[in-house]
From Swiss-Prot:
Pathway: Carbohydrate biosynthesis; gluconeogenesis; Carbohydrate degradation; glycolysis; D-glyceraldehyde 3-phosphate and glycerone phosphate from D-glucose: step 2/4. The keyword Hydrolase does not apply. This is Glucose-6-phosphate isomerase. GO terms for molecular function: carbohydrate derivative binding; glucose-6-phosphate isomerase activity; monosaccharide binding.
Length: 547
């Protein structure tokens, strides 16, 4: 039986018909304790989902749908290393990277032992650099770490580093290079000293075009200063699942850190792919980062579905995507330190859930995934919240608020007020009675107020979740990221798709090689469609190779 034919799914269709014409204002008016009932705390996070177009029966039916998809079994497979891809290879075992309590996994002991060894290696390097004992080619201590990678090899470490900057030990600084455009590289290193700069090359296969090209640029940049190749070897580390290729590139074997094939790039920040972060904040704080994620792992495995934060977050997304036909979801963090979180979550969601084939190879017959995007509040209030408030689409929003940036900082009350004000407005709207009352109180005549009111109405009934971190620290950040990882995994289980591959992106890379040959050597263009052929000819014309 397919997902859409299951009894809970059919019941959800009827529930949608019942609720689609109701307004959330009425839910709150009828239930004064709704905000209390539809909220929970876990792993250092507070989650309010009361401003959603659901009642308790909806939640029950969504949970039944999850059970019908064997979610309990699939959760245990995630934590036991029993998930495999279409080739039978283990995937999705990133949860092992943050198993910090007695290492109690029942299977894959070899993997756990390798993880422990990796931890020790990361810890030792972090201590050496932070204490100034790791030297460059002129015997100066390292001050700048440059992470070269792309996708998950860059987005995760950069996001986490920026979020945890108060924990970075001066004078250490981290920088991140990902783009094939050489501007990214040269603008990053422009103010750096080659004598005190360490490059970390992160690539699972060590064949990624963008990463290797930037690694080559790094080699040339260092050689201009050091003059001799043997002198720059201490300035390179590699994180990869292909150590032999990293060694062929010129990385010393002792400077190569393991990244296992069963860890996807977008789930790799917990591994040595987070080496730059571990160096910057120190091993103890990095371990707190892992502990926070593990706390959310434990909650995810143990809590009942209707009290389970990742599962509820996923089921609500399913509700809006598959029944309200929402095409997009927004993530709005109210903390400057979380500026890169929307980009990170965009990749996590869209690369994992952008699939149209089920696990058995058959076509999907229901919507999967959505466009996930966002920006910082309050900046976003002055750019695109207008679409949320007075547009015509259903756009679920996740608001993420931080009460205090650190133990020493002040409460972020103005930010919190804006965050809560946005969520309340999205829910209740601004009806004509309220608009007229406010306009008349401003001294505007009734007739003019009537005309103005039409343009100021806000229908409301737009869903949102609010997630609150008491403090933004390594533990709470780890918990927050694991929350969204598990949310995405639950969605993939219900849609019966594989969240651990991304074959779609490979085709464009392959075609880029052919097009580059045409641009460089004027090879036969008959294999290209007429549009691509015309674009190639235009580039060649401007370049001066064609009349």
């Amino acid at each position: 039986m397919s997902l859409v034919e299951s009894p809970p799914w059919q019941a959800l269709k009827s529930k949608y018909q019942e609720l689609s014409s109701l307004h959330m204002r009425d839910f709150f008016a009828q239930d004064k304790k709704r905000g209390t009932r539809l909220s929970l705390e876990a792993a250092g996070l507070y989650f309010d989902y009361s401003k959603n177009r659901v009642d308790e029966k909806t939640i029950d039916l969504l949970c039944e749908s999850a059970n019908a998809c064997n979610l309990p079994l699939r959760i245990e497979q995630l934590f036991s290393g029993k998930l495999t891809n279409e080739s039978g290879e283990m995937v999705g075992f990133h949860t092992a990277l943050r198993q910090v309590n007695n290492f109690s996994f029942k299977t894959n002991n070899n993997a756990i032992q390798e993880i422990h060894a990796s931890w020790e290696k990361i810890k030792k390097l972090s201590i050496r650099i932070r204490e100034g004992d790791y030297k460059g080619f002129t015997n100066k201590s390292i001050t700048d770490i440059v992470n070269i990678g792309i996708g998950g090899s860059s987005l995760g470490p950069q996001m986490a580093y920026n979020a945890l900057k108060p924990y970075v030990k001066a004078p250490l600084r981290c920088h991140f290079i990902s783009n094939l455009d050489d501007t990214d590289f040269y603008e990053t290193v422009r103010t750096l000293n080659p004598e005190t700069t360490l490059f970390i090359i992160t690539s699972k296969t060590f064949t990624t075009k963008e990463t290797l090209e930037n690694a080559r640029r790094a080699t040339e940049w260092l050689m201009q200063a050091a003059k001799k190749e043997n002198l720059i070897q201490t300035h390179f580390m590699a994180v990869t699942a292909a150590p032999e290729k990293a060694h062929e590139f010129g990385i010393q074997k002792d400077n190569i850190f393991m990244l296992w094939p069963w860890v996807g790039g977008r789930f790799s920040v917990w591994s040595a792919a987070g080496l730059s972060l571990a160096i910057a904040i120190g091993w103890e704080e990095f371990f707190e980062f892992l502990r926070g994620a593990h706390a959310m792992d434990t909650h995810f495995r143990q809590a009942e579905f209707n009290k389970n934060m990742p599962i509820l977050l996923a089921l609500l997304s399913i509700w809006y995507i598959n029944f309200f036909h929402a095409k997009t979801q927004a993530i709005i963090p109210y903390s400057q330190r979380l500026v890169y979180l929307p980009d990170y979550l965009t990749q996590l969601h869209m690369e994992s859930l952008g699939k149209s084939v089920q696990l058995d190879g058959s076509a999907v017959h229901w919507q999967t995934g959505a466009v996930v995007w966002g920006d910082l509040g309050t900046n976003s209030q002055h750019s695109f919240h207008q679409l949320f408030l007075q547009g015509t689409m259903v756009i679920p929003v996740d608001f993420i608020a931080v009460l205090k940036n650190s133990r020493e900082s002040h409460w972020q009350l103005p930010l919190i007020a804006n965050c809560l004000g946005q969520s309340q407005t999205l829910m209740e709207g601004y009806d004509k009675e309220g608009v007229m009352r406010d306009l008349i109180n401003q001294g505007i005549e009734h007739e003019k107020a009537e005309k103005l009111a039409t343009y100021r109405l806000i229908r409301g009934n737009n869903p949102s979740n609010t997630i609150i971190l008491e403090e933004l620290n390594p533990y709470s950040l780890g918990s927050l990221l694991a929350l969204y990882e598990h949310k995405v995994y639950v969605q993939s289980v219900i849609w019966n798709i594989n969240p651990f591959n991304q074959w779609g992106v490979e085709r464009g890379k392959h075609l880029a090689k052919d097009i580059l040959q045409a641009l460089q050597a004027e090879t036969d263009q008959s294999s290209f469609d007429s549009s691509t052929e015309r674009l190639i000819n235009y580039v060649l014309k401007i370049k001066g190779n064609r009349p």
